[in-house]
Structures are given as C-alpha cells and as structure tokens.
Regions:
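Transmembrane alpha-helices and adjacent helix-loop boundaries
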Residues: 4-190
Length: 190
C-alpha cells in the first residue's frame, strides 16, 4: 500500500521538478524539504496526536502508513529526479529530431535510463524506510521494536531480545538488499 502510493507520488513530484512546472514546482520543493528535514517520529506524532486536535481522527496503522508514505515519497522523488537530471539533454533532442513525440521520448528514451540510474538510490531508500518502521511503537503500532520491548518487560532478557531484533531485521532487509543488487545489475545500461 505504502509502496504503490509512493511510486505514484515520487514519479509525479520528480516530473514536476524536472519539467519545471512553475507553481507546482515550489509546492513540491516545499513538501520535499518539509518531509526530509523533519524526523519521522515528529511526523508520526503530528499525525497521531496533532490531527485529532483539529477533528481528524487516525488510528495507529493509518498513522504509520501516512507517515511512511509522506517521508518515503520525498526521498524517492529526489532519487528519481536525480536520475532524470543525469540524462544528457542531447538524448531528448536527438529523439525529438528523429520524430518521436515528447511522450514517446520520455517513455522509451529518458525513463528507462533514469530508472537504471536511480535504482541504487531507490533500494537504499527502501531499506532506510523499512528500518524507520522501528519508531512506529511510539504511536502504539505494534512493530518489531514494540515486540522486543514486550519481551524485555516479560522476561528481563534485554540482550537476547535485542539480538533477536537484529536477526529479525536482517531476515527482512537482507533479501531486500539482494533484490536491489539483482535489479541494479538487470537494469544497468552499458
């Protein structure tokens, strides 16, 4: 859910910045700066504790999804924008001179290369976001950290519970990292 919402938002934000859409570009830049320069924990607190003060109720799961999507969308947008800007302008000019439309140029020439260039940053951001879920327990959303704290409270085995937490994160993140390496190799352009 978070991933699909982020994919749409990050591509849209990156395209707005890349195409330099006048008013929307400033709005997107403001969103990216706000999101990237405030900690996820503060964003979660604002959503979970602040929004109900103005009549918008959220449960912990919605808070987690919205907070992670808000943060992740900005990081992914910047990763994709940097991939778009890494493409030499001559490639777009060449494609247009060969008779491709702007849409075809983006779809067949620019976007595949931008995805390839952006893939390492995308995967690093995915891993970063998965690790950021450890703060969800602050808004009563059960996550691995919440479970580890419960184990510590029940059995007073701090070292063992934290070691188990590390193993769980490795079991989750190592396959994601390997998938990222595989995707990077598969999408690499010569």
């Amino acid at each position: 859910l978070v991933g699909s919402e982020m994919c749409i938002r990050d591509r849209l934000c990156a395209a707005i910045q890349y195409e330099r859409v006048p008013v929307l570009r400033q709005i997107v830049a403001g969103y990216i700066e706000l999101s990237r320069n405030t900690p996820l924990l503060i964003q979660l607190f604002f959503i979970y504790y602040g929004l109900p003060k103005i009549g918008i109720k959220t449960d912990p799961a919605v808070c987690g999804v919205v907070g992670l999507a808000f943060l992740g969308g900005s990081y992914m947008a910047e990763a994709f924008r940097s991939g778009l800007e890494a493409i030499e302008p001559i490639q777009q000019e060449s494609a247009l001179s060969l008779g491709l439309t702007r849409g075809q140029t983006m779809r067949y020439v620019i976007l595949p290369q931008a995805m390839s260039i952006s893939m390492p940053a995308f995967m690093a951001n995915v891993i970063f976001l998965l690790k950021e879920t450890s703060v969800f327990s602050a808004v009563s959303l059960m996550d691995l950290m919440f479970t580890a704290k419960d184990l510590i409270a029940m059995y007073a085995k701090t070292t063992e519970a934290l070691a188990l937490l590390v193993v769980c994160y490795l079991l989750i993140l190592l396959p994601v990292s390997l998938l990222g390496s595989w995707l990077e190799r598969r999408l690499r352009y010569a």
